[in-house]
Amino acid sequence: MVRSVWKGPFVDGYLLGKAEKVRASGRNEVIKIWSRRSTILPQFVGLTFGVHNGNKHIPVSVSEEMVGHKFGEFAPTRTYYGHGADKKAKRK
């Protein structure tokens, strides 16, 4: 289900402040965030965020195409190791 347009995009309040501090300093440092639910806004373009995946922070460089998506979409939480090997085939 899509969020109502009249509500606007959801962004945690502290995230805007952190992004402004990095922009003002001019340094290109990774902004560590735990808010996977926050929407990527146009003022985040060009910044690098470390999105927490439950284990570590995955660096995500925000581009124009990412605006409107959620941070959590770009930091997978599960690792796929493939399906289990067929033990009968190995014995032969």
UniProtKB/Swiss-Prot annotation:
The gene is rpsS. One of its GO terms (biological process) is ribosomal small subunit assembly. Belongs to the universal ribosomal protein uS19 family. Keywords: Ribonucleoprotein, Ribosomal protein, RNA-binding, rRNA-binding. It comes from the Bacteria. This is Small ribosomal subunit protein uS19. Protein S19 forms a complex with S13 that binds strongly to the 16S ribosomal RNA. GO terms for molecular function: rRNA binding; structural constituent of ribosome.
